[in-house]
């Protein structure tokens, strides 16, 4: 196993992307992928999978604060299922509650308002999702 994991923060306009290593438990952002109503350019997803050859793909699961599902939850599940179906990748869903809030705070701290563009926030959220996945011992 490579120990490399790829994470996505699903969104209807932008999908954040991060790459991480299980051995170090760390992740870094990659360029976010634009989406049209939640549909990405699948050739970009395929390119990422071929380039990084992750042992698994982690997709953030958007839940309400009380743990219940919201409308975007089903769409994130569908996105995860499509990655598995199209590419045969091992896909795991991971709770992403507060990842965007944490990402915005971290980016603002380091770069002010200029750092808060949509793609940066989404990919920083993907980093938080992946590092949280590592912290929970997966």
From Swiss-Prot:
It is an enzyme of class 3 (hydrolase). It holds the Pfam family RuvX. Its main location: cytoplasm. One of its GO terms (cellular component) is cytosol. It is found in: Cytoplasm. Keywords: Cytoplasm, Hydrolase, Nuclease, Ribosome biogenesis. GO terms for molecular function: nuclease activity. It comes from the Bacteria. Coiled coil: none annotated. Its EC number is 3.1.-.-. GO terms for biological process: rRNA 5'-end processing. Gene3D superfamilies: YqgF/RNase H-like domain. Could be a nuclease involved in processing of the 5'-end of pre-16S rRNA. This is Putative pre-16S rRNA nuclease. It comes from Enterobacter sp. (strain 638). The gene is yqgF.
